[in-house]
Amino acid sequence: ESEASGHTFIQVTEDGENGILYYPGTNGRVTVESMLLALDACEKDDIVMLQNELPDTAGLIEAALERGLRTVLNPSPFDASLLKAPLERLYALIVNETEARGFLADEAEGVEAAGLMALLERRYPDVNLILTLGSRGACGRVPGAEPFFVPAVKMKAVDTTGAGDTFAGYAVAALAAGEDLRTAMNRAAKASAISVTREGAATSIPRRSEVEALAV
């Protein structure tokens, strides 16, 4: 009660791009016991999405998988401790270009963005993959199928803060509702496009009705 929860400090440039400084605060002191209780409240085959803002995310991934949960990782922010997790057993991995390079390390040196998906496919053949590329769009891959591209929905950016979180949240919600990966990504692209037209993070996330009303 005497300490602050997590804070994110964001600087926005004139063209809407951002730089982010994250302070975990009490988020970094959540106990393993409380996290496991949350997982125990889920039912088998439920989808659980993890980022990397809690202690021992790698251990939490393993615990979720042991409980039969479809586990999605959106490693924001990335750090090397995540490589200890059984990532090859994830249901889905959602990464931007920087995060993808973190997972691939030396393999990605000198590789253009277009080649990152092929490297991710080779490393995680049984995982649904999403590689977001900002204003360029996103690549997706379902295990056993060819990768595909979902173009970004073009909108005038005011503030890109929260666009990645909006994309990931809408994509995972669509998957949980039974939609296929391509459909989920198209919905997420529309949602994130709306979000960049507004200032702020959580306040910029559109309602579902707004996303459904957006004609592209």
List the predicted regions and their residue ranges.
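A glycine-rich helix N-cap at a beta->alpha junction
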Residues: 1-2
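Ribokinase/PfkB-type carbohydrate-kinase core domain
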Residues: 10-148, 210
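Conserved phosphate-binding/catalytic region of the ribokinase-like
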Residues: 80, 85, 106, 110-216
